[in-house]
Amino acid sequence: MNILITGATGYVGRRVVKQLIENDKNISILTINRDINKAQSILPFSNCKHVSVNDMEKEVLLFSPNICIHLATLSTSRNDDEIINPMIEANITFGVKLLATLFKVDSLQLFINTGSFAEYRNGVENGFNDAYLYTATKSAYRHFVDYYSQLKGFKYINAVPFTIYGGDDTAKKLMDYMMESINAKEPVKMSPGNQILDFVHVDDVVRFYVSAVNSINNISLLPNGSNYYLGTGIGTRVKDLATLIESKIHKRLNIFWGGLNYRPLDVMYAVAPTEDNNQVIPWKTQISLDQGIDKLIKKYDIYEN
């Protein structure tokens, strides 16, 4: 099977590539990159070819992918003038060029698009209501995916990750700031902490993409454009998360609650409606929040004294 992956060197992407190769030594992977040297360093696998975005059309046509996993994105809460052009380029222009290239191949069966829970600021049941400029570009991009899907006839699904944590991402997550606050000299400023979020471990998110690849023979049974909500289905208040961490390490987190204001359109409740996920792709989380925090404590080497 030939799999095309964008964003392969990212937080989720690098884990997806490694897991796919671990599961199937005969798989062939093509990654599209802005920095080939970085890709070769992070993913030095013989059955994984890394090519430049400038050579995308030529290389994709030669590769003839069966599946495309689209993870590349510019994710930020910024909406200032300087971020607009790079965000449109990364989240829309590049993605549309990718689709235009895939239109020229006859092998593609499935396109896995990746969205964000913050596209649904007022809940999935209320449809799109973007919290950030970033998520507005993600919502807009879906229309392009749907257009090319209908034009060419390939199937597509939308993976919608909720609040991902865990692993060794260079971009710090909420839990990382919490853990680092323990030894901080000054309190770490955070919002009032009343958001209720669905914390999903990165390893569980990776399992979804692998499961989708393994389900390729049943993809015809899926309604086109199906959403898969990648979360546990359980919400936890941010302040309660801090309390849970404190109960495990028997130390206080040095946090100044309310030191930062909520963002203008902040998401106050985001829990994955996992019951809506079509079981054609048989996926559910395996790592509870309790287990995930234990992994994080081990990562930071923080134990009760």
Across the structure, where does each feature detected by a protein language model lie?
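Conserved C-terminal active-site "lid" loop/helix of NAD(P)H-dependent oxidoreductases
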Residues: K38, V202, N227, N261-Q291, ...
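C-terminal "lid/loop" region of Rossmann-like NAD(P)-dependent oxidoreductases
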Residues: T31, G225-Y228, R237-A242, H250-Y269
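NAD(P)-dependent short-chain dehydrogenase/reductase
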Residues: F144-L197, V202-N214, G233, T243-K248
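Active-site helix of classical SDR
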Residues: L133, T137-A140
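N-terminal Rossmann NAD(P)H-binding glycine-rich loop of SDR-like oxidoreductase domains
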Residues: I3-N23
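NAD(P)H-binding glycine-rich loop region in Rossmannoid oxidoreductase-like domains
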Residues: S52-A90
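Conserved Rossmann-fold NAD(P)-dependent oxidoreductase catalytic core, especially the SDR/UDP-sugar
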Residues: H70, V96-L133
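SDR active-site strand-loop-helix element
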Residues: T6, I32, C68-L74, F111-F117, ...
